[in-house]
Design a protein with these regions (language model features):
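N-terminal targeting/export leaders
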Residues: 2-7, 14-15, 19-126
Length: 126
């Protein structure tokens, strides 16, 4: 009985020590949901931010906007234009940027996607 208790205690200690190391090495980053605006009630999206020493990466996507197929949408982070992407035939657009192209992201940083005419599609914050 004591062996099992010692083994379980040791295993728990190893997990407790290794989990923060995995998270500190970048892990999966921070992912947020982008919620639909009134003009596009079926739309949804997501954004993921990953940061390591000397490296930043931001990915964002919008889905369920089939009526915008073939049109260009613009992605914004903290009010800054991150870039544009064309909506595919299935109603989705995706963008990914690294390092210098990624503005500073902190708690409360807003990510939004708008049409070429400036109509809000989805929005969310870290």
């Amino acid at each position: 009985m004591k062996r099992i208790t010692m083994f379980l205690t040791a295993a728990a200690l190893v997990l407790a020590v290794s989990a923060p190391a995995v998270l500190a090495s970048g892990g999966g980053g921070t992912r947020i949901a982008l919620r639909s605006a009134q003009a596009f009630p079926a739309a949804k999206g997501a954004a993921t931010f990953k940061a390591k020493p000397g490296e930043r990466e931001l990915e964002a996507e919008v889905e369920h906007v089939r009526r915008l197929a073939g049109k260009t949408v613009t992605f914004y982070v903290a009010g800054q234009k991150l870039g544009s992407a064309k909506v595919g035939a299935l109603g989705a657009a995706h963008i990914a940027r690294r390092n210098g192209a990624v503005p500073a992201v902190r708690a409360g940083t807003v990510v939004s996607v708008k049409t070429a005419g400036g109509v809000l599609i989805v929005k969310g914050s870290f």
